[in-house]
Amino acid sequence: GLARAYEALRAADGFALLDLNEAQTLRDLGWRGPLLLLEGVFEQRDLELCSRLDLWHVVHHEGQIDMLSRHKTQVPQRVFLKMNSGMNRLGFAPQAFKSAWTRLNALPQVDEISLMTHFANADGESGVAAQQQVFEQFSSDLPGERSLANSAALLRHPAAEAVLADWVRPGIALYGSSPDH
């Protein structure tokens, strides 16, 4: 499945994946562009593979920052710092976001920090406005590219500022499914 998806999507700016094996497969297929691990790393040794394969990865808890601080690398990594703006699955609490950014920014193992969140209600009545407001309140003074929009935000709120961010993450829509179902 991944090889077929790659052939169909090879004009994409990047790919976001859940596991290191998928990232290795895309590199083996010849993809040299950005690869983002959406759940980040789970073990210290995962960072070695991130370095070797030039992977970007999400940082959503303190343990991942601790692992990065112990990582021995000659090539600093790009990370996506994730804020929990309402999904309540992964990410730093809004009040802890700047502190996490400061810790990451001080690490020589990190060369670029992008900022992200995930819209829990993009497919519902409440939309993205409340979560976008929380995200902006706690990140507006931080530098870095932004990634906020998921499939539901892209389809239901195409003119929203969040959709016009640097990176969007269509997921379920790539399979032809509506995020409403």
What is each of the regions a protein language model found here?
Residues 155-181:
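Active-site loop ensemble at the mouth of alpha/beta enzyme cores that anchors a bound cofactor
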Residues 147-152:
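Polyanion-binding loop/helix "lid" in catalytic or ligand-binding cores
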Residues 1-144, 158-161:
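Active-site-proximal beta-alpha core segment in soluble small-molecule metabolic enzymes
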